[in-house]
């Protein structure tokens, strides 16, 4: 009769406790079934779900590439200016050398 001691204790418990346990197990069962259904849906529609996460960047986040593009343009412009200044300096040097040669 040792095995029936637990049953005797359950009979003495209030009915609301049994109802609470039933509701709790129903909720757990429902959560498991919904999770399983979502898993099956995800397997079936994997491409649709991945398309959501690979959307093109919004206008707010596109300012960073523009910033870096403008930085590269500024650097390119600086390099071109330095190159043109160096060419002008070289041309002036060669002109002054030719003038000195013609004077001699």
UniProtKB/Swiss-Prot annotation:
Membrane topology, from the record: Single-pass membrane protein
Pfam families per record: UPF0697
Chief location: membrane
Protein keywords: Membrane, Transmembrane, Transmembrane helix
A Gene Ontology term for the protein's cellular component: membrane
Subcellular location: Membrane
Listed InterPro entries: SMIM19
Superkingdom to which the source organism belongs: Eukaryota
Transmembrane portions of the chain: 20-42
Family to which this protein belongs: Belongs to the SMIM19 family.
UniProt xrefs under PANTHER family: SMALL INTEGRAL MEMBRANE PROTEIN 19
Identification of the protein by name: Small integral membrane protein 19
Organism: Danio rerio (Zebrafish)
